[in-house]
Design a protein with these regions (language model features):
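The feature marks helicase ATPase cores and/or their adjacent C-terminal helical subdomains
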Residues: 1-525
Length: 525
């Protein structure tokens, strides 16, 4: 057990694997975690061990030995091999099969239906907690809001249709666990290491219990103070009591991430939980002093200037984290757009607006002044221009124009662009989706104005990396600086609130900013 940033994954598990490798070999050593990203980190850590390198095992050797719990259960059960994993394309088929699924078919759902669709979230949470749909609905916090636009009657009907749709054709994560937990197949395991054990759901714990019966050594690695997936079946009380007994070398104490200021503040947040379960943790900070500053809002707080200056003038990373979507939509993203910062969600590789698109807006004035641009760059202008500025709405056919640099006047003479364009330096006003007199800006107009703001604020070459994500999204991450929003939209268990705040704050290495509530309800820290 160890608090955030004490090397549970990169140091302790590495040491344990090395020890058991000498004792048992690698053939029947299993290391499990919850996500593919975490599994890759573990794989990279373990395969960097000198003795493991000397084994010269193929990469595939570790695919079934260092992986997610779902992957292991899928590969070690009697689940029919002809079943395909239910994915995005299967979801599209399902929507045609039963139209009620399409009732929540927005852009976020279409991108990742298994995580974002209310039905699949509810189904996963019910299964993770070991409850049927009716009991899960009764025990959920404001389910009508959480699983909007569906009510229990709809979800039950959808469950029946979903099960019928995937019968003998598809399998999902719940099926993988169910087949494994009901299997009579013998397992041969020398040692089993479970990372982030505190996040295990009810069926995952049953799966680990089954594995443990066949293992010579079982090690659970984690931190009960970071148990924040109760809605999906995690049991903080069980792991608080389990890990409270851990002492000696199995208790990690040296902090490798958080500065003194963040470490001190984080311990104040979590101390009431330590007191309740009657244990104390030794958790040292790094040598850096760091700071924790408070923001009353994201408009005019005194400490906000410090944050903006650091975001604008450093090459460090900044993480905005929060409890609800209201925080994201109503003040965090509006602040980032207003200040003209480039940003992205923690799950995305690319910024909200990519550099290629930004370049179109930034280089347009110089193109008008006669600076030659490549054919590819001019095509980017042409694709986005409103049709009234195109003398020829179609882009030149391949081979009909030489691939070289051209000036604005060259394309006017060739009959593709209008001379009228010279009157407008701001490309965003020429965009095909720009609405000058609209009472309420649509998505594209807001985006165009945001791009213009980046250029106005001279943030095109921004060095800092700015990300956002809710407390559950950011768990497991490390960033240089963290901004923690305390706003709540509903009442929650006091210890749950402390764990959420603790997880959010301890993502930071150097400095933290605490944003006071903007809703009237505030996270207890």
């Amino acid at each position: 057990v160890g608090p955030p940033g004490t090397g549970k994954t990169h140091i302790k598990i590495k040491e344990l694997y090395k020890e058991y490798l000498h004792k048992y070999g690698s053939e029947r050593g299993i290391v499990l975690t919850h996500t593919n990203v975490a599994a890759k980190e573990l794989k990279d850590t373990i395969t960097s061990i000198k003795e493991v390198k000397e084994l010269k095992k193929e990469e595939e050797f570790f695919e079934d030995r260092i992986c997610t719990i779902h992957s292991y259960t899928n590969n070690n059960s009697e689940i029919p091999r002809n079943l395909k994993v239910f994915d995005k394309s299967a979801y599209e088929e399902l929507c045609k099969y039963y139209s009620l699924f399409g009732k929540a078919n927005n852009v976020y759902v279409r991108k990742n239906p298994m995580e974002k669709h209310p039905f699949f979230k509810f189904k996963s949470n019910a299964y993770g907690r070991g409850l049927d749909f009716k009991k899960c609905w009764m025990k959920s916090e404001n389910p009508s809001r959480a699983y909007d636009p569906y009510d229990l009657k709809m979800l039950l009907a959808m469950q029946e249709k979903y099960n019928k749709f995937k019968e003998k054709k598809y399998k999902d994560f719940e099926d993988m666990l169910e087949y494994f937990n009901n299997s009579k197949q013998d397992l041969v395991i020398d040692f089993l290491i479970v990372d982030e054990a505190q996040d295990c759901s009810v069926p995952q714990m049953l799966a680990i219990e089954r594995m443990a019966k066949h293992a010579k050594v079982v090690v659970m690695v984690g931190d009960p103070n970071q148990t924040i997936f109760q809605f999906a079946g995690a049991n903080p009380d069980f792991f608080e009591k389990l890990f409270a007994k851990v002492k000696g070398d199995d208790e990690l104490k040296k902090g490798l991430r958080c500065s003194k200021a963040i470490n001190t503040f984080a311990k104040k947040i979590i101390k009431p939980i330590w007191d309740f379960y009657r244990y104390e943790r030794v958790w040292s900070p790094t040598d850096e002093e760091g700071s924790v500053q408070f923001l009353t809002n994201l408009k005019g707080s005194p400490a906000l200037k410090n944050l903006i200056n650091k975001m604008r003038n450093s090459n460090e990373s900044f993480l905005f984290t929060y409890r609800s979507a209201k925080s994201r939509e109503d003040w965090i993203l509006p602040f980032l757009k207003r200040e003209g910062f480039k940003f992205k969600h923690v799950a995305n590789k690319n910024n909200h607006v990519g550099d290629e698109e930004l370049n179109v807006y930034y280089t347009w004035p110089e193109f008008l002044k006669g600076v030659p641009k490549s054919l590819g760059e001019i095509k980017q202008y042409h694709e986005r221009l409103h049709k009234k500025y195109k003398c020829n709405k179609n882009w030149p056919r391949e081979g009909s124009i030489i691939n070289k640099e051209y000036t604005f006047q060259d394309f006017v003479r060739k009959g593709y662009l209008s001379e009228e364009l010279k009157k407008e330096n701001s490309f965003y006003k020429l965009h095909k989706k720009y609405k000058k007199d609209s009472e309420q800006d649509d998505y594209q107009t807001v985006k165009i104005k945001y791009i213009n703001r980046i250029i106005q604020k001279d943030n095109l070459n921004q060095k800092s990396i700015i990300e956002y994500g809710n407390f559950h999204d950011v768990k497991g991450l490390t960033r240089d600086n963290v901004i923690v929003d305390l706003s709540l939209t509903r009442d929650e268990d006091k210890f749950d609130q402390r764990r959420l705040g603790f997880v959010g704050l301890t993502r930071g290495r150097h400095d933290a900013w605490i944003l006071k509530t903007q809703t009237g309800k505030e996270l207890i820290i």
